């Protein structure tokens, strides 16, 4: 059967299962009538009255805001339907759009042998951020399912990661640890979890070692973006799927372990079927996601995934939040605030109280919990920060979309080694400045369970960034499930808890190489634009943009977040400072 490549076309139909194929990825196009979303004008009486009431206090919106309010989305959000003969598909409505998900849970592990039918060995290639977590979760889930499928780690000969893999229970003697090329050649499902730059440099050899009709599994769409930039595609004799946890590897493992007694917990994941040679691809991908412990799995395409993911980690997930706290810490201390309090009112405020509130109640709850004076400070910060943040986010998205950012990652990976007579330039530290040393002191005296203060100005800047990122993804046609996971859930439930535990490096450097590079590259851009534009506007007494504030109150994303909150992990992640489930070089008991 010829390989079938899935389309990005939106689909809200649910065709009947084909008798000739147990699994079919449906990509029928259907025109979606765009509702009034985000910063669009609305005929809703409630929205009109809210806008009129808020705008009545004398401040006016900018001409840019007026253009935004009257503009329409570039394209409708993508909504992909799929079929599965193993798991239960469920329809959810997010901001007026229908999407399909599969709920997870340990009670579904019994279905894994059916989902993985025909698979005898799963090769997990790489031992970076995702490799250890996914390999261990898969192994443990398959054992619980009483499956004899082998999970085998494939590494480069001489790799220092062999010892780490052995410590996690994978050994050469048991046939669960071996050479990368032998593992690829012997596996029916190959999970390619090496760095993106390494994938770009080695994909031809990887493809040549794969069995015909085997399945290539990705946890990031980066390789597709790299191939597209060269006018290439995947071999037509293999299936290509993706399962992309919306969080760093250590979070994937930590929540899986924490949730063992309560029917599972983990990190939400997206899945995609890019190429299906024999009709098994969707069930295999869903089985993979369920085995990782994903509370819910939503559909995307490989292209939409890499655009939103690479963009998101440079935005609010990592780079932008780093830029925000650096900028605000400097502002607060320059204005006379003590260093300890400035750290609490920036980092601790975002990673503690704000994150917990957004995770459980949404962004509006952050605003509503403030005093009247605090709400004014929030609005001032939000109004001044929204468009400067959007400017950098817009640039970043288009750099990803054009392939420029992907090329940057590949080139950066090559600079890690000496070449052309020039020295190697590995990634440097990002937590050695005064601010982060203050953070060490603050954490040492922090009471157990303390979530820090809720500082209104910081909250306004952070929420403005979050809403600007949501709007960029929405205008670019991403589905609400993808938007919310990449802009909200991954940030507050997976990543920020690591910065709360031990600072910015502990968050950023537990992530993939691509994420670490992007965070370092883009954080200074957000720091700069906030300092040079947003904070200058505040100090000059610029009027609050009431169009932005009223549209924030009425944005339909709040209702969509409320639906997604009901699908969040069953436990909150616990990240002690001496965590042993993180990268080896980041394991220590101090700070």
Curated annotation (Swiss-Prot):
The record, for Pfam families, names: KARI_C (PF01450), KARI_N (PF07991)
Active site annotation, chain numbering: 220
UniProt EC number: 1.1.1.86
Q: Specify the KARI C-terminal knotted domain's residue ranges.
A: 301-449, 450-586
Transit peptide location on this chain = 1-52
Where, in this chain's numbering, is Mg(2+) 2 bound? Answer: 309, 486, 490
Which InterPro entries does this chain map to?
6-PGluconate_DH-like_C_sf, 6PGD_dom2, KARI, KARI_C, KARI_N, KetolA_reductoisomerase_plant, NAD(P)-bd_dom_sf
Q: In terms of one coarse class, where is the protein primarily found? A: plastid
Q: What are the protein's GO molecular function terms? A: copper ion binding; ketol-acid reductoisomerase activity
Q: In which pathway does it act?
A: Amino-acid biosynthesis; L-isoleucine biosynthesis; L-isoleucine from 2-oxobutanoate: step 2/4; Amino-acid biosynthesis; L-valine biosynthesis; L-valine from pyruvate: step 2/4
Oligomeric state and interaction partners are given as:
Homodimer.
What is the protein name for this chain?
Ketol-acid reductoisomerase, chloroplastic
* Species of provenance: Arabidopsis thaliana (Mouse-ear cress)
